[in-house]
Each structure stands twice: as structure tokens, then as C-alpha cells.
Amino acid sequence: MAPKKKKVTGLIKLQIQAGQANPAPPVGPALGAHGVNIMEFCKAYNAATENQRGNVVPVEITVYEDRSFDFKLKTPPAAKLLLKAAGLQKGSGVPHTNKVGKVTMDQIREIAETKKEDLNARDIDAAAKIIAGTARSMGITVEG
């Protein structure tokens, strides 16, 4: 007979700097409310994201009835990848009036390759259009 499936009691979504999870907010309160061992998660997350330092890595934590958990790492947010590609700190406050940076279509395709698994696009061209739209809404001009 197959083992029983664990009952899910919660799903937590967080965006944390890679390799820098600690019990302080926002991690501690979010996990503590579900009774999860916070230090155990922090150690596991930091080990899993060690090679992505400098990026914000979204994580989806599934909490089970017995207070155990597992987590799934996502790709960094498109906005963060675009800011890095354009060499900016932040996007424009009025994106359709003030343009703050430029990215090439090659950079857009590279970001689309990275994000493809998290986007609901059938191919790279569709994913690139999604990323280009994000860039425009941040005041970043797409060249090419």
C-alpha cells in the first residue's frame, strides 16, 4: 500500500536575498505563524541559494500538518533582472514619460531564457514580449 500523503496546512510565498535568510522579519513571523522550525528553513534556503548571491530569489514554502515543510525556489523577479541588465538601482516613477535606461533585445532574450520556466509562455518569443512589457512599465527602453 502506498504511504499516506501529508496534509498541507499552509503555503507561504516570500522573496528573500539569496543566501541571507535569517529569523528576522519577514521570514520569522511568516514561518512562526505556521509553527515551522525557522532555523531549519534558513539553513536549508541559504545552502540552496548559495550560488545565487546578490539576487532576490522567491521561494514557495509548503507547510504540512506535522509542521514539516518543503520549499521550491523560483527564478529571480523579472524586474530585478532588468534593473541589473540596465545597470540601474530602481525604475522610473513615471515610466511612460521619464525613461531611465536601455536594454537590448539580446538582453531581453537572455532574461526570458532564465524566466521561461516561471512564465506562462509557449516559446522564447512570447516570453521575450512579456519581459519587454515589464521593461517598458519600468521606464526602460528596449532597443532592437
Swiss-Prot record:
A GO MF term: large ribosomal subunit rRNA binding
Modified how: One or more lysine residues are methylated.
Gene Ontology annotations of biological process type: translation
InterPro entries: Ribosomal_uL11 (IPR000911), Ribosomal_uL11_bac-typ (IPR006519), Ribosomal_uL11_C (IPR020783), Ribosomal_uL11_C_sf (IPR036769), Ribosomal_uL11_CS (IPR020785), Ribosomal_uL11_N (IPR020784), Ribosomal_uL11_N_sf (IPR036796)
A matching Pfam family: Ribosomal_L11_N
One term under GO cellular component: cytosolic large ribosomal subunit
Keyword Ion transport recorded: no
SUPFAM superfamilies: Ribosomal L11/L12e N-terminal domain (SSF54747), Ribosomal protein L11, C-terminal domain (SSF46906)
Segment forming the signal sequence: none
SMART domains membership: RL11 (SM00649)
NCBIfam families: L11_bact (TIGR01632)
Protein family: Belongs to the universal ribosomal protein uL11 family.
Function (record text): Forms part of the ribosomal stalk which helps the ribosome interact with GTP-bound translation factors.
Protein name: Large ribosomal subunit protein uL11
Biological source species: Corynebacterium efficiens (strain DSM 44549 / YS-314 / AJ 12310 / JCM 11189 / NBRC 100395)
Gene name as annotated: rplK
